[in-house]
Each structure stands twice: as C-alpha cells, then as structure tokens.
Amino acid sequence: VAISASAQPIAMRVFDASERPDLVDDLTPLVDGDVRFDDYSRQLYATDASAYERLPIGVVLPRSTDDVSAVVEYCFEHEIPVLPRGGGTSLAGQTVNEAVVLDFSRYMDEASIDPETETATAEAGITLGKLNEAAAEHGLTFGPDPAWGDKSALGGAIGNNSTGAHSLVYGKTDYYIEEVETVLADGTVTTFGEVEIETLREAGDPTSDDIRERIYASVLEILEEERAEIDRRYPRLKRNVSGYNLDALVEDARGTRPLADGTGTDPDSEAGTVNLARLLAGSEGTLAVVTEATVALEPEPETKAVALLTYDSLLDAMEDVAPILDHGPCAVEVMDDVLLKLARDAPEFEEVVGLLPEDTHSVLLVEFYADDADHGRQQVADLVADRVGNVETEVTANTNRVTTNKRRYASHAMEAHDAEARATFWKMRKAGMPILLSRTSDAKHISFIEDCAIPVENLPAYVEAFQDVLDDHGTNASFYAHAGPGVLHVRPLVDTKTAEGVDQLEGIAADVTDLVVEYGGSVSGEHGDGRARTQWNRKLYGERLWGVFRDLKTAFDPKWLLNPGNICGVLPDEEPSGTAVASHDMTEDLRFSPSYEFETGFDPALEWANENGFQGMVELCHGCGGCRGPQSTTGGVMCPTYRAAEEEIQSTRGRANLLRSAMNGSLDEDELLGSEFGAEVMDLCVGCNGCEVDCPSGVD
C-alpha cells in the first residue's frame, strides 16, 4: 500500500531520559487527566501478567477522548511511541512497551445500557465485571468471559479479541462489536463501523495524507487481492486471534459471517459491506486507540447444569471432546493428572478433589445452559448415558483387530445442578493457575505457548506430540482449560534466569509452533500475540500475509508509533531479510533474564519457609491484576487500599512490583529504605492479609 512521502515509516529514535521533564511540561496543559513520568509510576507500568518487563517513557491517565487525542497528536508530531492499556492483564506482553502509556482504567470507565436494542456503549477503561454488573440489571450480559474479565478492561478485550470458557456459545469479542470510537495515529478522532465496499472504493486513496482514506484503500486492496491467500492460510478455527483479523473482513464482504456459536451464518450478515470495528479486534493497540465502543449484549441464561467426567488418561479425555460437543455444551474444560496431584496436596482444594475416584488421571467439566432445571438434568443425563460406561466393541472380519463403535471413554460421572454444587466443580477447574503460579523457585510456569488452538479432532495427536516436545527439552507442564474449542493452556516450567533456560524457552516455542502449523491450528486462541508470539506469525501465515499485515499497519500507523513491535514485528527499515530470521525476538525484555540481579541490602528479620526464601516471595507476583477489583465484582478482601484509592501503587501488584524493583536495581539502591518508598508503597498497607488468601499466587 503506497503512502504519502510525508508519512513514511521512521526509524525508531532512542528516547533520552533528559527529555522527560520537557514532555511533562508539554503534556500537562494538554490534558485534564494525570501526567505521571516519575520513576515509581513508570516502574508500575513496566510489567503486566506476562513474563515480560519494559520500562515505559511515562504514563498519562486520560479523562476523555479529547485527552487521548491531544496526547496521541503530540506524540505523532514528536515521534514518540504510544501504548493504550486497560487492566494490564495481558499474558503475552502486549501491554508493556517503551512508550507513553495511556491508562484508561482510572477515569474512562463509564457505560450506558440500552435494554431495547440489547447493546451497551462503554468507555474503553471499564472492566468487563463492571459492564456486566450494569447489564445484569436488565437481564443481559456481555458474552465473552475471559478468566480475568472482572479486572480486565473492555478496551483490552477489543484489543485482544478476548473470549473465555464459554466461547462455544459466545465466540470472540469481534462478533459483538458494532461500532468503535478511535483516535488514529495522528490524533484524529474517528468512528469505525459498517461501511459499504463501494464507499471504500470511492473514498480510498493510498497516497492521501488523510489516514482514514489510506485505511480504506488498504482494506479494499486486501479484499480484492488477498482473499484467496487468506482462505488458504488462516486456520479454520473459531478460536484464532493471531495476526490481524483479516478473515473477519472477508467473511463480512461475502456475507458469510458465522454466528457466535458457529452453527450457521449470521442472518444480519450482508455481502458488500464490512465492519471495520471488527478489524480492530485483536489488533493490540497497533492500528488505532479505541476510546469507546458499542457492543451487543446477550440474555443471561436461565439456568445451568454441570457434569464432571473422569478419565483414565489425558489422551482418553482428548478423544472424548469431539463426541461431547455433539451434545451442545456451553463449556468443556479439562484438568490433567499433574494438576490433580498438586490439587490433592493443597489444603484449599483437597476436599474438592477428594470427591473424585482415586484412579482419576484427567477430568472434563462439561457445562450446559438450560431453559429450566428439568432441561438441564436431561442434558446431563443424555451426556452420561452416551459417554460414560464400559467400552463397547465390535469384532470386524479381521479377528486380530478390534475396533470401537461409539466408544465410551469416561469412567465415572458426577452431576451438579444447584449453584453451590456447580461452584464447587468450577473451583476445582480454576485451581489450575493458582497452583502452578505459586512456585517461589527460579524456575516458573511461564506463559509463552500456553494459548495454542487446535481443531478438536486433532487434539489427541497434538497433545501426545506436545508431550514429546516437553520431554525433548527436559521439562514438564500441565494441560488444562478450554478443551471444547481446542485451546489447552500449557505453561512449561522454565528458568529464564539462566542462558540455558532462555534457549529452552525459544526452542520449545519453535517446536510447538511447528506442531500448530502441522495440525491446522493457531499459536494464539485467546491471549494474543504480544512479545511472546509475534515472532511466530511469519511462520504461521507465510511471507505474503506477513507483508499484508505490515502494509495494513503502515496504512493505519504511518510512523509505526502505536505499540510498535507487536503482531507484525519491527519497523520496515529494521526488518531482517530472509524467513529464517525472526522479526521480533521473544527472548528480549524478559522480566527474569540471565542479567537479572536481586539484592535486598539487608538481612531479613523473618525466616521464610519456602524455596528462595524472602526473594522467592518478593518475586512471586505474576501480575494478573486480581487485586484490582471492587468487592461487587471480584469478591474477597484483596485489596482494600486499591478499592479505596483506585491507584495501581496501592494494589498488591503495585507494591510487589515496586518492592522487587527496589531490590533488583530498577530503582536506586537506597530507595527501599527511604522515607518516600515507605510512605508511598508500604505504609498504607493495612496488613489485612487479604492478598495472602485471595491472590492466586499467594502473594503476601
């Protein structure tokens, strides 16, 4: 896509710290929100829920779209990168960058619900928990339900094209986006929604100085020139968020957009139009800054029913996923024997896991939405009758070979129909992450290939091959989460504080990406590309579509200033030649790397009965943001000071990050014992121990 000579992509300049005071002076009068470029604020936004850390240039907390526009326009003129951010719950590192961070979560979090049209118009910083709280007053809900939805923001859900455990029914966020208000790379405020292809043809101009006109030209070229390649290279999956959402564009243009549950074509889908708001879904803030969105809502289900099926092995459970889907569940979740063993040893989960037969090596949690209680019981009864019991076999003409006829894999089943019983089963399923992330050792269960999506018919072979990869690299992992749509969360145990561990990280990712391509999958089914997976998009989609991604990026963002490095790699003039060279290195900017150091500067007075002692506890927070939520949506106690102040520095995550930063050299060495650190970071902690109880990692 050609662009005007005045807007050619630039080489990213190195930002000089001496420029920071001038930036503060320039930005402060431009906005009504807060401008924070101090060391504490920058360190607070250097991490998210991923394995990555990158210190931002500074942070702005906007109060309005006008604030956002002013900041983006200033940064465009001065060639400074910009990063939009919500709750900072990204698992792939897409919400950390050397940029001016726009934190929408502090002020831009309002929503209005229209029960007549079953839609919500909401600001980008509202959490999905708060949005659903407002929608529930009208018997409605926002369908996509990411695990940390009560803490993650709507803008992040759009940027990530998020979904969750119930994607079998609700699909991804892009299905629900009707319209978005955005700030383009030059600060222009514009709205994207449905547009006729003929309008793209009439208004598009690849040489214009108007970014929107260049966008129209780029989208039209994709629709006219790249449909066949998109059809050929995009995985045929409901759960694919790798790369840009080009297949959604093609579906819109053809009038073949599927329903959220994949059961047919959306009757509202008409050929000849595309919804450019859907294109922004999954773009991770690299194309435009979303400030507000109108999204469709769904009626809340009348009731639910749950069956818990037990299996002799993980592979048996994987074989059973496809037949279970024939029963129309809303969720099919898996836990393997690794997690079950760990759960049995954890006091908080011991009673729940104790309900299972002793020889259980894997479980599938199968949930149904039902019209009423009787309907729910019948759905479970039909499932159990079909999938649980003795293996049925038939002998073929070849008496040496026994084949199965409608084989029943599950060895045992339990049912839950009232809310308390269902919650017990789900508690066991959700035990996975807390157990895995509570390690205080240097080796940790890291998210980097935890989100691959595979066609369910290929799950058994894929899992077996994945286990071989782990064996080859001398490590282990647990397989858990969304078996129904083929998205298994796998976090290998890796010590990135060693050079060998970093090599192991990249080696596993390379081998697993090969498996994903072989089995027709995607490297990301819900968590996005970010720093962890951008490197592999070139292998997944091929050179031609990789080039299309980069051309589209240039049309939207001519100077490549919006969250640079994510989805389509580095700047064009820095792009290495040849497919063997990665355009983005997943091993850069790791939170824990071979160069990482930790020094308290004092001997702790208390003894810590865990691996790595005090250091292990300081490094325990993985950044999920579970401490950032109101009582009404997150429950529990954690964290009362954040709930009162709504300031990151007063969250458990904020305190943990700054404490670690003071001991690893990110802050001045004398900072830890200084009066400012005590007053700002530690003194307002009320000592309630809510974090120790509620934090999934057990941060104290």
Model features per residue range: what roles?
Residues V180, T188, T207-E224, A228-R232, ...:
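Polar, glycine-rich mid-to-C-terminal structural blocks
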Residues F592-C624, R628-D700:
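Ferredoxin-type iron-sulfur electron-transfer modules in oxidoreductases and energy-metabolism complexes
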